Amino acid sequence: MSIPLYLYGIFPNTIPETLELEGLDKQPVHSQVVDEFCFLYSEARQEKYLASRRNLLTHEKVLEQTMHAGFRVLLPLRFGLVVKDWETIMSQLINPHKDQLNQLFQKLAGKREVSIKIFWDAKAELQTMMESHQDLKQQRDNMEGKKLSMEEVIQIGQLIEINLLARKQAVIEVFSQELNPFAQEIVVSDPMTEEMIYNAAFLIPWESESEFSERVEVIDQKFGDRLRIRYNNFTAPYTFAQLDS
């Protein structure tokens, strides 16, 4: 009976066994060439892996350590992928998607994924916005203590929302104008929290990261304490390595 395999990622070049990596359940990570693709894997000790912080970080660490070793072009596989044998990989992944896998490798060659998440204090922004729009502030203040119709409540709420959205878009536009020219491809995702106003990944030339990072720093200084910027400059290219359904 074959031992199930936990998969981490796919590479266009062979990964030597001299690269020592520790995977999930503290199992050694190996490489296996299937057709023309090199897979990083370890023996699976569980049928299903819990998406705990430790397990997720271990999965990411395997890929990032491989990238640090010089194998920068890769297709990261989703966390928790366990297969029973390599024949399953041939029949379910390589045979139906071989051309697309090669196209993804070509797209990612010489490129890296970086990501930006921008946060602001929603309450502070609302207060600042009201202070800069005295007519809107006066309109809201005049309504305090009064019995309002549903139409009046909706109207003032919409005016506030429109002005906050304009402030948000003005911030995003600064980032877009400065950073978008670096990117071959950009994916903007939905914010994950109320405080997050922008969540984007950029596929940029590998050697452009230092200049990209400097631009982020300049923007950060421009906005000061108004924003919190979370910049990730080293990650496997999950966003740009998606197979079409």
Swiss-Prot record:
One of its GO terms (cellular component) is gas vesicle. InterPro entries: GvpL/GvpF. Its main location: other. It holds the Pfam family GvpL_GvpF. Coiled coil: none annotated. Belongs to the gas vesicle GvpF/GvpL family. Binds GvpA. This is Gas vesicle protein F. It comes from Dolichospermum flosaquae.
